[in-house]
C-alpha cells in the first residue's frame, strides 16, 4: 500500500492525492466501525461459550478495548507520511511512548486495567489523531488542518448514526437468534455482521462522496477480473 501511495504522490496531482486520501480514510473507518460494532455486541457471548462468564471483562475495560481497536484500525495518516518522505518528525514516537507509559502507570494505579487501557488510548489520540494528521496536512498536503477535522467529524457522525439505526433495529425489529450453543452463536454473529454492515454501508454511501467513489472503484476493479 505504501508503494502505491508513493507512486500516486510522485505524480504530483494534489486533487487526485486528496481524493484517494479521503477514499482510503473513509473506507478504513467504515470497515473499522463494522468490526468494532460486532466486537462490542458479540465478544461477551463468545467468551462465555469459550471459557465461561467468570472471565468476562468489566464493562469499562471492555468498551475501552473496543475503542482502542477502532483507533488502531484507523491510523491512515502514517502511510501518507511515509510516502511523502516526512521523516523529520523523529520525536513523535518518543513522545507517544512516554505518554503511553506515563499515563498507563498513573491511571493504572488508580483505575486498574481500565486505567492502563485509557492511558494507551489518550497517548494515541494525542499523537495518531492529533499531531500526525496536523503534520501531514501542514508539511505534506500543505492545507489547513481544519479540513481534516471537519472530514473526520463527518465520518464519526455517520458512524454514530449507523450505530443508532442498528441499535434501534436490534431492539425493536429483530431480537436476534437465541444463542444456546456455538452453532446458534455463529448464525447470530453472521446476522449481526450482515445487518449492521448493510445499514452502515447505506449511511456512508448516502452521505459521503468519497465512499461512493470507493464503492464504484471496488466494483469496477471486481468487474475487470
Sequence positions of predicted segments:
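Helix-loop junctions and terminal segments of transmembrane helices
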Residues: 1-25, 29, 79-83
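Interfacial segments at transmembrane-helix termini and the short loops linking adjacent helices
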Residues: 22, 39-72, 141, 177-183
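Membrane-interface junctions at transmembrane-helix termini in multi-pass inner-membrane proteins
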Residues: 66-95, 105, 110
Amino acid at each position: 500500500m505504501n508503494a502505491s501511495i508513493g507512486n500516486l504522490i510522485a505524480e504530483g496531482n494534489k486533487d487526485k492525492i486528496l481524493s484517494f486520501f479521503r477514499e482510503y480514510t473513509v473506507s478504513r473507518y467504515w470497515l473499522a466501525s463494522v468490526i468494532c460494532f460486532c466486537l462490542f455486541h458479540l465478544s461477551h457471548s463468545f467468551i462465555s461459550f469459550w471459557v465461561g462468564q467468570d472471565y468476562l471483562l468489566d464493562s469499562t475495560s471492555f468498551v475501552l478495548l473496543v475503542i482502542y481497536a477502532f483507533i488502531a484500525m484507523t491510523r491512515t495518516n502514517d502511510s501518507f507520511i511515509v510516502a511523502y518522505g516526512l521523516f523529520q518528525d523523529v520525536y513523535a514516537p518518543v513522545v507517544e511512548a512516554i505518554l503511553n507509559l506515563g499515563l498507563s502507570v498513573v491511571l493504572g494505579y488508580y483505575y486498574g486495567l481500565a486505567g492502563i487501557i485509557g492511558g494507551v488510548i489518550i497517548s494515541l489520540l494525542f499523537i495518531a489523531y492529533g499531531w500526525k494528521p496536523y503534520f501531514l496536512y501542514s508539511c505534506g498536503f500543505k492545507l489547513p488542518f481544519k479540513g481534516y477535522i471537519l472530514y473526520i467529524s463527518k465520518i464519526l457522525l455517520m458512524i454514530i448514526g449507523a450505530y443508532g439505526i442498528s441499535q434501534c433495529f436490534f431492539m425493536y425489529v429483530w431480537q436476534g437468534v437465541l444463542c444456546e450453543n456455538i452453532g446458534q452463536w455463529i448464525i447470530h454473529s453472521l446476522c449481526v455482521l450482515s445487518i449492521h454492515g448493510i445499514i452502515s454501508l447505506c449511511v456512508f454511501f448516502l452521505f459521503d462522496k468519497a465512499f461512493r467513489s470507493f464503492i464504484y472503484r471496488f466494483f469496477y476493479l471486481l468487474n475487470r477480473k
